[in-house]
């Protein structure tokens, strides 16, 4: 049942029209620090790809390549816990611009 609830949350979050723009979401921050790492990585990747799709679709292949090379968890803090990070900057963060 717990996995079903998380799957539903991920599905809804992945389909959201706009990902969060602020780098701080108290609930997501707390969840991402305690949840299963695989689930967190899946959510981080979905959120990053939603930002790419909305802001810089031409970067989709490059961002996917970088995310697949590993280290998805390194974006956890800036996406969900950093009050000073604007999530629009995540693409530059991922591809090293």
UniProtKB/Swiss-Prot annotation:
Disulfide bonds join 29-81. The keyword Hydrolase does not apply. GO terms for cellular component: host cell periplasmic space. InterPro entries: SPACKLE_T4. Belongs to the Tevenvirinae spackle protein family. Inhibits viral DNA ejection into the host cytoplasm, thereby conferring the infected host bacteria with immunity against secondary phage infection. Achieves superinfection exclusion by localizing to the periplasm and inhibiting the activity of tail-associated lysozyme, thereby preventing penetration by the tail tube of incoming phages. Monomer. Interacts with the baseplate central spike protein Gp5; this interaction selectively inhibits the lysozyme activity of the baseplate central spike protein. This is Protein spackle. It comes from Enterobacteria phage T4. The lineage of its organism: Viruses, Duplodnaviria, Heunggongvirae, Uroviricota, Caudoviricetes. The gene is sp.
